[in-house]
A protein has these predicted regions:
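Nucleotide-state-sensitive switch-loop elements of NTP-binding domains
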Residues: 2-139
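C-terminal accessory "lid"/substrate-recognition subdomains
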Residues: 155, 164-325, 329, 339-355
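Helical mechanochemical/support elements of P-loop NTPase systems and associated helical scaffolds
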Residues: 5, 9, 29, 41, ...
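Short, hinge-like loop/turn segments at secondary-structure boundaries
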Residues: 51-54, 146, 202-205
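Phosphate/Mg2+-binding loops and adjacent switch elements
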Residues: 83-197, 202
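A secondary-structure boundary/capping signal
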Residues: 9, 36, 132, 159-160, ...
Length: 355
Protein backbone atom coordinates (compact mmCIF):
# COMPACT_ATOMS: atom_id res chain seq x y z
CA UNK A 1 0.00 0.00 0.00
CA UNK A 2 1.32 3.46 -0.89
CA UNK A 3 2.34 5.71 1.95
CA UNK A 4 -0.05 8.56 2.74
CA UNK A 5 1.55 11.94 1.92
CA UNK A 6 1.41 14.33 4.86
CA UNK A 7 1.95 18.08 5.10
CA UNK A 8 2.75 20.07 8.22
CA UNK A 9 1.22 23.56 7.92
CA UNK A 10 2.86 25.95 10.35
CA UNK A 11 3.35 29.66 10.89
CA UNK A 12 3.19 32.17 13.72
CA UNK A 13 -0.05 33.29 15.34
CA UNK A 14 -2.32 35.00 12.82
CA UNK A 15 -0.16 34.28 9.78
CA UNK A 16 -3.13 32.93 7.83
CA UNK A 17 -2.86 29.15 8.21
CA UNK A 18 -6.57 28.58 8.74
CA UNK A 19 -7.47 30.90 5.85
CA UNK A 20 -5.17 28.93 3.56
CA UNK A 21 -6.46 25.59 4.84
CA UNK A 22 -10.05 26.72 4.37
CA UNK A 23 -9.35 27.51 0.73
CA UNK A 24 -7.67 24.13 0.25
CA UNK A 25 -10.74 22.43 1.71
CA UNK A 26 -13.04 24.35 -0.63
CA UNK A 27 -10.98 24.06 -3.81
CA UNK A 28 -12.16 21.54 -6.39
CA UNK A 29 -8.96 19.51 -6.48
CA UNK A 30 -10.47 16.03 -6.21
CA UNK A 31 -8.47 15.16 -3.09
CA UNK A 32 -9.86 13.96 0.22
CA UNK A 33 -7.89 15.56 3.01
CA UNK A 34 -7.81 14.47 6.63
CA UNK A 35 -7.01 17.44 8.84
CA UNK A 36 -5.44 17.31 12.27
CA UNK A 37 -5.47 20.77 13.81
CA UNK A 38 -5.06 22.40 17.16
CA UNK A 39 -4.84 25.82 18.72
CA UNK A 40 -3.08 27.34 21.74
CA UNK A 41 -5.75 28.07 24.32
CA UNK A 42 -8.69 26.56 26.14
CA UNK A 43 -11.10 26.71 23.21
CA UNK A 44 -10.79 25.61 19.62
CA UNK A 45 -12.31 28.19 17.28
CA UNK A 46 -10.96 26.84 14.01
CA UNK A 47 -13.53 24.07 13.75
CA UNK A 48 -16.11 26.88 13.62
CA UNK A 49 -14.17 28.78 10.94
CA UNK A 50 -13.23 25.82 8.75
CA UNK A 51 -15.80 24.63 6.24
CA UNK A 52 -18.07 22.22 8.06
CA UNK A 53 -19.69 20.41 5.14
CA UNK A 54 -16.57 19.75 3.08
CA UNK A 55 -16.36 16.04 3.92
CA UNK A 56 -12.85 16.20 5.32
CA UNK A 57 -11.99 14.63 8.65
CA UNK A 58 -11.09 17.16 11.34
CA UNK A 59 -9.61 15.91 14.60
CA UNK A 60 -9.39 18.46 17.39
CA UNK A 61 -6.65 18.16 19.98
CA UNK A 62 -6.82 21.40 21.92
CA UNK A 63 -5.59 20.19 25.30
CA UNK A 64 -2.03 21.14 24.40
CA UNK A 65 0.34 21.75 21.53
CA UNK A 66 1.01 19.08 18.93
CA UNK A 67 4.66 20.03 19.14
CA UNK A 68 5.15 18.58 22.58
CA UNK A 69 2.46 18.00 25.18
CA UNK A 70 0.14 16.09 22.85
CA UNK A 71 2.82 14.33 20.82
CA UNK A 72 1.33 11.04 21.94
CA UNK A 73 -2.09 12.17 20.80
CA UNK A 74 -0.69 13.06 17.37
CA UNK A 75 0.75 9.57 16.99
CA UNK A 76 -2.54 8.01 18.08
CA UNK A 77 -4.52 10.31 15.80
CA UNK A 78 -2.40 9.37 12.78
CA UNK A 79 -2.50 5.67 13.58
CA UNK A 80 -6.25 5.76 14.24
CA UNK A 81 -6.85 7.44 10.88
CA UNK A 82 -4.71 4.82 9.14
CA UNK A 83 -6.59 1.94 10.81
CA UNK A 84 -10.00 3.42 9.95
CA UNK A 85 -8.84 4.00 6.39
CA UNK A 86 -7.63 0.40 6.07
CA UNK A 87 -10.96 -0.85 7.46
CA UNK A 88 -12.89 1.23 4.95
CA UNK A 89 -14.52 3.36 7.66
CA UNK A 90 -13.18 6.62 6.22
CA UNK A 91 -11.56 7.64 2.97
CA UNK A 92 -8.77 10.17 2.51
CA UNK A 93 -5.82 10.73 0.20
CA UNK A 94 -3.52 12.77 2.38
CA UNK A 95 -3.12 14.45 5.76
CA UNK A 96 -2.58 18.08 6.68
CA UNK A 97 -1.47 18.86 10.23
CA UNK A 98 -2.13 22.50 11.11
CA UNK A 99 0.00 23.38 14.13
CA UNK A 100 -0.63 26.07 16.69
CA UNK A 101 1.03 29.40 15.96
CA UNK A 102 3.37 28.85 18.90
CA UNK A 103 4.54 25.40 17.81
CA UNK A 104 8.04 24.32 16.90
CA UNK A 105 7.48 22.09 13.84
CA UNK A 106 10.58 20.01 14.54
CA UNK A 107 9.00 17.61 17.06
CA UNK A 108 5.89 17.32 14.87
CA UNK A 109 8.06 16.26 11.92
CA UNK A 110 10.01 13.92 14.19
CA UNK A 111 6.81 11.96 14.83
CA UNK A 112 6.98 10.52 11.30
CA UNK A 113 10.36 8.94 12.02
CA UNK A 114 10.23 7.80 15.66
CA UNK A 115 6.99 5.78 15.59
CA UNK A 116 7.08 2.56 13.55
CA UNK A 117 3.33 2.42 12.86
CA UNK A 118 3.26 6.04 11.69
CA UNK A 119 6.29 5.41 9.49
CA UNK A 120 4.64 2.35 7.97
CA UNK A 121 1.62 4.35 6.78
CA UNK A 122 2.70 7.95 6.24
CA UNK A 123 5.27 9.90 4.23
CA UNK A 124 6.15 13.41 5.39
CA UNK A 125 5.82 15.41 2.18
CA UNK A 126 6.79 18.88 3.38
CA UNK A 127 6.74 21.48 6.12
CA UNK A 128 4.96 24.56 4.74
CA UNK A 129 5.35 27.77 6.76
CA UNK A 130 3.00 30.73 6.32
CA UNK A 131 4.66 34.08 7.12
CA UNK A 132 2.72 37.28 7.82
CA UNK A 133 4.40 39.97 5.69
CA UNK A 134 2.87 42.73 7.82
CA UNK A 135 4.17 41.53 11.19
CA UNK A 136 6.97 39.05 10.46
CA UNK A 137 9.90 41.40 11.05
CA UNK A 138 8.76 42.07 14.62
CA UNK A 139 7.80 38.44 15.21
CA UNK A 140 11.14 37.10 14.01
CA UNK A 141 12.93 39.49 16.34
CA UNK A 142 10.74 38.89 19.39
CA UNK A 143 9.87 35.19 19.16
CA UNK A 144 12.23 32.27 18.73
CA UNK A 145 9.26 30.11 17.70
CA UNK A 146 8.81 32.26 14.58
CA UNK A 147 12.45 31.71 13.59
CA UNK A 148 12.16 27.96 14.15
CA UNK A 149 9.10 27.78 11.91
CA UNK A 150 10.97 29.54 9.10
CA UNK A 151 14.14 27.55 9.65
CA UNK A 152 12.34 24.22 9.39
CA UNK A 153 10.29 25.10 6.30
CA UNK A 154 10.50 23.26 2.99
CA UNK A 155 8.30 25.97 1.45
CA UNK A 156 7.51 29.49 2.68
CA UNK A 157 4.25 31.24 1.78
CA UNK A 158 4.07 35.00 2.32
CA UNK A 159 0.63 36.27 3.35
CA UNK A 160 -0.69 39.84 3.64
CA UNK A 161 1.78 41.26 1.10
CA UNK A 162 -1.00 43.67 0.10
CA UNK A 163 -0.56 45.42 3.46
CA UNK A 164 3.10 46.37 2.90
CA UNK A 165 5.08 47.97 0.09
CA UNK A 166 7.41 46.19 -2.31
CA UNK A 167 10.53 47.32 -0.46
CA UNK A 168 9.27 45.78 2.78
CA UNK A 169 8.48 42.50 0.99
CA UNK A 170 11.98 42.42 -0.52
CA UNK A 171 13.58 43.10 2.87
CA UNK A 172 11.53 40.34 4.48
CA UNK A 173 12.40 37.86 1.72
CA UNK A 174 16.09 38.63 2.21
CA UNK A 175 15.77 38.00 5.95
CA UNK A 176 13.87 34.75 5.41
CA UNK A 177 16.52 33.56 2.95
CA UNK A 178 19.23 34.28 5.52
CA UNK A 179 17.39 32.10 8.03
CA UNK A 180 16.54 29.36 5.52
CA UNK A 181 18.26 29.54 2.11
CA UNK A 182 16.84 26.13 1.11
CA UNK A 183 13.13 27.00 1.12
CA UNK A 184 11.53 28.59 -1.96
CA UNK A 185 9.21 31.55 -1.24
CA UNK A 186 5.77 32.13 -2.80
CA UNK A 187 2.77 34.31 -1.90
CA UNK A 188 -0.58 33.36 -0.38
CA UNK A 189 -2.65 36.52 0.05
CA UNK A 190 -6.15 35.79 1.39
CA UNK A 191 -5.24 32.09 1.28
CA UNK A 192 -5.01 32.17 -2.53
CA UNK A 193 -2.10 29.80 -3.05
CA UNK A 194 -2.08 27.21 -5.83
CA UNK A 195 -2.55 23.70 -4.46
CA UNK A 196 0.84 22.90 -5.99
CA UNK A 197 2.43 25.35 -3.52
CA UNK A 198 1.12 23.37 -0.56
CA UNK A 199 0.60 19.67 -1.36
CA UNK A 200 2.75 17.06 -3.13
CA UNK A 201 5.90 19.16 -2.83
CA UNK A 202 8.19 16.21 -2.08
CA UNK A 203 10.17 18.80 -0.20
CA UNK A 204 11.11 17.14 3.07
CA UNK A 205 14.74 16.03 3.02
CA UNK A 206 15.82 14.21 6.17
CA UNK A 207 19.50 14.85 5.46
CA UNK A 208 18.86 18.60 5.31
CA UNK A 209 17.06 18.47 8.64
CA UNK A 210 19.91 16.51 10.20
CA UNK A 211 22.30 19.20 8.95
CA UNK A 212 20.18 21.80 10.75
CA UNK A 213 19.63 19.67 13.85
CA UNK A 214 21.88 16.60 14.29
CA UNK A 215 19.67 15.47 17.21
CA UNK A 216 16.49 15.54 15.09
CA UNK A 217 15.91 11.78 15.40
CA UNK A 218 16.72 11.67 19.11
CA UNK A 219 13.58 10.71 21.04
CA UNK A 220 12.56 12.95 23.96
CA UNK A 221 14.14 11.87 27.20
CA UNK A 222 17.38 10.64 25.65
CA UNK A 223 19.03 14.00 26.21
CA UNK A 224 16.87 16.65 27.81
CA UNK A 225 14.38 17.39 25.03
CA UNK A 226 14.47 18.54 21.46
CA UNK A 227 17.43 20.61 20.32
CA UNK A 228 15.97 22.27 17.26
CA UNK A 229 16.90 25.95 17.25
CA UNK A 230 16.93 27.91 14.02
CA UNK A 231 18.41 31.38 14.40
CA UNK A 232 19.55 34.23 12.24
CA UNK A 233 23.27 34.85 12.19
CA UNK A 234 25.43 37.69 10.99
CA UNK A 235 28.17 37.46 8.39
CA UNK A 236 30.76 37.01 11.11
CA UNK A 237 29.18 33.81 12.33
CA UNK A 238 30.76 30.59 11.17
CA UNK A 239 27.62 28.47 10.98
CA UNK A 240 24.13 28.64 9.56
CA UNK A 241 21.32 27.27 11.66
CA UNK A 242 22.51 25.13 14.53
CA UNK A 243 24.43 26.18 17.64
CA UNK A 244 27.82 24.67 18.25
CA UNK A 245 28.81 23.07 21.52
CA UNK A 246 30.13 26.36 22.91
CA UNK A 247 26.99 28.43 22.39
CA UNK A 248 26.02 30.40 25.45
CA UNK A 249 22.42 29.41 26.16
CA UNK A 250 20.87 26.14 27.13
CA UNK A 251 18.94 23.91 24.75
CA UNK A 252 16.15 22.81 27.03
CA UNK A 253 12.81 23.10 25.29
CA UNK A 254 10.70 26.01 26.49
CA UNK A 255 7.03 25.28 25.87
CA UNK A 256 6.13 28.88 25.07
CA UNK A 257 7.06 32.34 26.27
CA UNK A 258 5.77 32.47 29.83
CA UNK A 259 4.20 35.90 29.32
CA UNK A 260 2.05 34.67 26.42
CA UNK A 261 -1.35 33.44 27.55
CA UNK A 262 -4.78 32.75 26.11
CA UNK A 263 -8.20 33.42 27.56
CA UNK A 264 -11.76 32.88 26.36
CA UNK A 265 -14.96 34.90 26.37
CA UNK A 266 -18.27 33.05 25.92
CA UNK A 267 -21.88 34.20 26.07
CA UNK A 268 -25.26 33.15 24.69
CA UNK A 269 -26.40 36.80 24.68
CA UNK A 270 -26.00 38.76 21.46
CA UNK A 271 -23.61 41.67 21.01
CA UNK A 272 -24.77 45.18 20.17
CA UNK A 273 -22.81 45.71 16.91
CA UNK A 274 -22.07 49.41 17.45
CA UNK A 275 -20.94 49.05 21.06
CA UNK A 276 -18.77 46.05 20.19
CA UNK A 277 -17.10 47.84 17.28
CA UNK A 278 -16.26 50.83 19.48
CA UNK A 279 -14.90 48.67 22.30
CA UNK A 280 -12.77 46.46 20.05
CA UNK A 281 -11.44 49.56 18.32
CA UNK A 282 -10.35 51.00 21.66
CA UNK A 283 -8.77 47.68 22.65
CA UNK A 284 -6.55 47.48 19.59
CA UNK A 285 -5.52 51.12 20.00
CA UNK A 286 -4.29 50.50 23.53
CA UNK A 287 -3.25 46.84 23.53
CA UNK A 288 -2.74 46.09 19.80
CA UNK A 289 1.02 45.47 20.00
CA UNK A 290 0.40 42.89 22.76
CA UNK A 291 -2.54 41.20 21.00
CA UNK A 292 -0.75 38.46 19.06
CA UNK A 293 -3.90 36.74 17.81
CA UNK A 294 -7.62 36.92 18.45
CA UNK A 295 -10.54 35.28 16.74
CA UNK A 296 -13.98 33.99 17.37
CA UNK A 297 -17.51 33.24 16.26
CA UNK A 298 -19.92 35.97 17.34
CA UNK A 299 -23.65 36.18 17.95
CA UNK A 300 -24.68 39.67 16.79
CA UNK A 301 -28.03 41.32 17.45
CA UNK A 302 -30.09 41.50 14.26
CA UNK A 303 -27.91 39.00 12.36
CA UNK A 304 -29.26 35.47 11.83
CA UNK A 305 -25.87 34.00 10.88
CA UNK A 306 -22.56 33.47 12.61
CA UNK A 307 -20.12 36.36 12.36
CA UNK A 308 -16.50 35.19 12.05
CA UNK A 309 -14.09 37.61 13.72
CA UNK A 310 -10.29 37.55 13.40
CA UNK A 311 -7.38 39.84 14.10
CA UNK A 312 -3.63 40.19 14.57
CA UNK A 313 -2.25 43.13 16.54
CA UNK A 314 -4.03 46.26 15.23
CA UNK A 315 -5.45 44.60 12.11
CA UNK A 316 -8.97 43.32 12.69
CA UNK A 317 -11.79 42.11 10.47
CA UNK A 318 -15.01 40.14 10.38
CA UNK A 319 -17.18 38.29 7.87
CA UNK A 320 -20.68 36.87 7.91
CA UNK A 321 -20.39 33.09 8.17
CA UNK A 322 -22.80 30.16 7.90
CA UNK A 323 -26.20 29.96 9.54
CA UNK A 324 -26.50 28.55 13.05
CA UNK A 325 -27.30 24.84 13.00
CA UNK A 326 -30.82 23.59 13.74
CA UNK A 327 -29.76 22.06 17.05
CA UNK A 328 -27.12 24.70 17.78
CA UNK A 329 -27.62 27.35 20.44
CA UNK A 330 -26.42 30.70 19.04
CA UNK A 331 -23.55 31.83 21.23
CA UNK A 332 -20.36 33.85 21.11
CA UNK A 333 -16.98 32.21 21.62
CA UNK A 334 -13.83 34.34 21.39
CA UNK A 335 -10.18 33.52 22.07
CA UNK A 336 -7.51 36.14 22.76
CA UNK A 337 -3.81 35.25 22.73
CA UNK A 338 -1.34 37.89 23.82
CA UNK A 339 1.46 39.11 26.03
CA UNK A 340 0.42 40.32 29.48
CA UNK A 341 -3.12 41.19 28.41
CA UNK A 342 -5.45 42.40 31.22
CA UNK A 343 -8.07 39.66 31.01
CA UNK A 344 -10.45 41.40 33.42
CA UNK A 345 -10.50 44.59 31.30
CA UNK A 346 -11.33 42.58 28.18
CA UNK A 347 -14.03 40.46 29.83
CA UNK A 348 -15.75 43.38 31.59
CA UNK A 349 -15.73 45.46 28.42
CA UNK A 350 -17.15 42.66 26.29
CA UNK A 351 -19.91 42.02 28.82
CA UNK A 352 -20.91 45.69 28.56
CA UNK A 353 -21.31 45.26 24.79
CA UNK A 354 -23.99 42.58 25.17
CA UNK A 355 -27.64 43.37 24.51
Amino acid sequence: MDLIPSTILTGFLGAGKTTLLNRILQEDHGMRIAVIENEFGEENIDNEILVQDSGEQIIEMNNGCICCTVRGDLIEALNSLARKRAAGEISFDRVVIETTGLANPGPVAQTFFVDEEVGAHYLLDAVVTVVDARHAMEQLTAHEEAQRQVGFADKILLSKTDLVDAAAVDALKARLQRINPRAPIATSDFGRAPIADVLDLRGFNLNDKLDIDPDFLRVDGEDGHDHDHQHEHGADCGHDHVHDASCSHDHHHSHHSDDIAAFVFKSERAFDPERLEQFLGSLVQVFGPQMLRYKGVLRMDGVDRKVVFQGVHQIMGSDVGPKWGENETPATKMVFIGKNLPKDVFIRGLEQCLV
